[in-house]
Amino acid sequence: MSASVLSVISRFLEEYLSATPQRLKLLDAYLLYILLTGALQFGYCLLVGTFPFNSFLSGFISCVGSFILAVCLRIQINPQNKADFQGISPERAFADFLFASTILHLVVMNFVG
């Protein structure tokens, strides 16, 4: 059983490293960073507490929102999804991501107080 799981993981990594464009790998690294940051904040909340609750909520909402926006960007710039997003260039998708991210962080900063 564990040998088959290891073979599936190794094949996944081989195909990911050989077939995934560099832009998507960079975006995946950003997604991993956001995921780990959100998990760290949630773990801190469980261990220490949520004394400044607005600060915790702001940070966690920022992580979740940024993750969602980055996933949307990844879907739009993936070459395999080109047929679904014919009218949107990768540059336009990135500009939309920057605009939405700016709005998200303005709302988060307003929520902090």
Curated annotation (Swiss-Prot):
Signal peptide start-end: none
InterPro entries: DAD/Ost2
Cross-referenced Pfam families: DAD
Keyword hit for Amino-acid biosynthesis: no
Residues annotated with N-acetylserine modification: S2
Gene Ontology annotations for the cellular component aspect, listed alphabetically: oligosaccharyltransferase complex; oligosaccharyltransferase complex A; oligosaccharyltransferase complex B
GO terms of molecular function: enzyme activator activity
UniProt keyword list: Acetylation, Apoptosis, Endoplasmic reticulum, Membrane, Transmembrane, Transmembrane helix
Pathways per UniProt: Protein modification; protein glycosylation
Keyword DNA damage: no
Quaternary state and interactors: Component of the oligosaccharyltransferase (OST) complex. OST exists in two different complex forms which contain common core subunits RPN1, RPN2, OST48, OST4, DAD1 and TMEM258, either STT3A or STT3B as catalytic subunits, and form-specific accessory subunits. STT3A complex assembly occurs through the formation of 3 subcomplexes. Subcomplex 1 contains RPN1 and TMEM258, subcomplex 2 contains the STT3A-specific subunits STT3A, DC2/OSTC, and KCP2 as well as the core subunit OST4, and subcomplex 3 contains RPN2, DAD1, and OST48.
Family statement drawn from the similarity comment of this UniProt entry: Belongs to the DAD/OST2 family.
The protein, known as: Dolichyl-diphosphooligosaccharide--protein glycosyltransferase subunit DAD1
